[in-house]
UniProtKB/Swiss-Prot annotation:
It is an enzyme of class 2 (transferase). InterPro entries: Acyl_CoA_acyltransferase, Autoind_synth_CS, Autoind_synthase. Belongs to the autoinducer synthase family. It catalyses: a fatty acyl-[ACP] + S-adenosyl-L-methionine = an N-acyl-L-homoserine lactone + S-methyl-5'-thioadenosine + holo-[ACP] + H(+). Its EC number is 2.3.1.184. This is Acyl-homoserine-lactone synthase. Keywords: Autoinducer synthesis, Quorum sensing, S-adenosyl-L-methionine, Transferase. Gene3D superfamilies: 3.40.630.30. GO terms for biological process: quorum sensing; signal transduction. The keyword Transit peptide does not apply. GO terms for molecular function: N-acyl homoserine lactone synthase activity. It comes from Serratia liquefaciens. PANTHER family: ACYL-HOMOSERINE-LACTONE SYNTHASE, ISOVALERYL-HOMOSERINE LACTONE SYNTHASE. Required for the synthesis of BHL (N-butanoyl-L-homoserine lactone).
Length: 200
């Protein structure tokens, strides 16, 4: 059974943090070749701190997907200008929002655990909406790649592109807003239930 849960940075066990940061290195450095900082075969940065909360998706106690949330009132990758060279002036609005970053689904583990038929992206996206709603946020902002945008669109989550930029690889990247309303939540639930019916 796939389980999804959130953990604050301060409560993250050592073994789980090592697993997370190792998987992030595999995804963002080894597979995607992003400009990220790596040390001891792990990827982490200054935003992995007490203001961060992580969503984990696990199967048989193995992490298969994850992302990091940071309230936009605290330093985060978008507001701090990490992506300024890729965009022409981006700024998050004032309000009670949360930024999502370092989102990944581990393809190798999905294959090894024979989960390729499971609606993992929809489950992860639903957990994002549920977390944001439970915490009283107005919505979620993130910067994503073009392939990730396609995954969002296929899931049924009606995200909106706030601004388009160009990465160091000359690929389109997007500042997106993710609404957390009932309609989007229900579409994701329907997609998950549709898969469950097929599997059943």
């Amino acid at each position: 059974m796939i389980e999804l849960f959130d953990v604050d940075y301060n409560l993250l066990p050592d073994n789980r943090s090592k697993e997370l940061f190792s998987l992030r290195k595999k995804t963002f450095k080894d597979r995607l070749d992003w400009l990220v900082n790596c040390e001891n075969n792990m990827e982490f940065d200054e935003y992995d701190n007490r203001h961060a909360t992580y969503i984990f998706g696990t199967y048989q106690n193995h992490v298969i997907c994850s992302l990091r949330f940071i309230e936009t009132k605290y330093p985060n990758m978008i507001s701090d200008g990490v992506f300024d060279t890729y965009f022409n002036d981006i700024k998050l609005p004032d309000g009670n929002y949360v930024e999502a970053s370092r989102l990944f689904i581990d393809k190798a583990r999905i294959q090894a655990l024979q989960l390729h038929q499971a609606p993992i992206s929809a489950m992860l996206f639903l957990s994002m909406i549920n977390y944001a709603r439970n915490c009283g946020y107005e919505g979620i902002y993130a910067i994503i790649s073009h392939p990730m945008r396609i995954i969002f669109q296929r899931s049924g989550w009606h995200i909106s592109v706030v601004k388009t930029g160009c990465s160091e690889k000359n690929k389109n990247i997007y500042l997106i807003y993710m609404p957390i309303d009932d309609a989007n939540r229900n579409r994701l639930l329907a997609r998950i239930n549709q898969h469950a019916t097929k599997m059943g």
